[in-house]
């Protein structure tokens, strides 16, 4: 008996998830360190906050077997990420939401934010250093966000950044899930 198109898409989606998870499965035992869960989720197009990761997602993943010593099993991760994807729990913010956030940091309306100010805000999100970006995430963000063509490369022109970011994220997600959606067409 042949699988329905919905079942085929689910099988392909599971394959994409398994492949992404496998990149971080250092020992080959179908587990990853809990610190990698957010990275894998973002790769798969879900963008939870650090507090959601720490307070909701990771505890749920470790709840199945607390003796795993910080290791998350593939089965627990797959179950969680399939629910997140189907319910659109952590889909990326749209460009208007992102622009509104940047405008809060630019009360003068200059159209840019100094990268040092941005570093300060992102390293202490919510007023707590523990909620901020990790150093590697910070350097990756700043490298991507700064205007390299400007005479003052310490500025982040946020409208350009948001346009670039949303286009790149949409393209990545579309490419990643193209096969899982049945190939060919543009993602909705």
Where are these regions (language model features)?
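EF-hand and EF-hand-like Ca2+-sensor regions
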Residues: 60-112, 119-132, 136-188
